[in-house]
Amino acid sequence: APGTYPYVLMNYTDDLESLSTLAHELGHSMHSYSTWESQPYVYSDYSIFVAEVASNTNQALVRDYLFRTVPDRDFQIGLIEEAMSNFHRYLFLMPTLARFELAIHERVERGEALTADAMMALMADLFDEAYGGEVEMDRERVGITWGEFPTHLYANFYVYQYTTGISAARALAEGMLTGGEEAVARYTAYLRAGSSLYPLDALKLAGVDL
C-alpha cells in the first residue's frame, strides 16, 4: 500500500529458477514503489495487464545480464532452459488455461455441471489442440493442470495477461538493451504512471503498441 515498503512473498531455494522468480517479483515491487512515489493515492494502483509487463521485463534483463557475464557453458545451457520453460509457461500453458477458463464459464452459463472428470477431459483436449497433436501426453496428469492454479483461476480472466505481459516485456527489454537512455526513460515513465493512464496507453508510453 502507498506509504509502506513493497514486500516479496516467495520461497527462495538458491537455484536459477528461484533467481528468475525473485527477479520477476522484484519487478512487481519496483513497479509498485515507483507508482506510489509518483502518483496521488487515486492513481497509486495499476492493472494486472501492465503489472505482468514489469515483472517479465525484469526477468528478461536479468537473463541477458547473466548470459553476458557468466561464460560457463553449463550455466548458460541452464539459463536457456529456464528461459524456454518460462516461454512455454506463458505462451502455451497460460493461453490454454485462459481458453479453459472461458469454456467452463460458458458451461456454467448453459446450466451444465462442472465435475472434476469433465474439467480434466476439457483441459487435456485443449492442450492436445494447443500442441497440434504433436506431443504425447499423459491425459490424466495434463488434465489436472487447472488444479495447480487455483489462485489465478479464482481471479476472473487473469491468466491471459501473462501472455501479453511476456510479449510486451521482451520488446521493452530488447529496446532498453539496444536503445539506450531514451528507452530506459520511457520505461521508467511507464513504471511511474500507475493508473493515471489506460493500460494500453501506459504501454505505448513505454514503447509498445498492443
Language-model features: locations:
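Long, charged, glycine-rich C-terminal linkers/tails
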Residues: 1, 9, 141-145
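Conserved acidic
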Residues: 18, 46-50, 76, 88, ...
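C-terminal, non-catalytic "cap/extension" segments appended to globular domains
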Residues: 22, 30, 57-60, 68, ...
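Short beta-alpha connecting loops at secondary-structure transitions
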Residues: 7-11, 38-48, 79-86, 105-107, ...
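Extended, non-catalytic scaffold segments that flank or surround catalytic motifs
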Residues: 42, 61-65
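Short pre-active-site segment immediately N-terminal to the catalytic Zn-binding motif
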Residues: 2-23
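Post-HEXXH active-site segment of zinc metalloproteases
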Residues: 20-21, 32-56
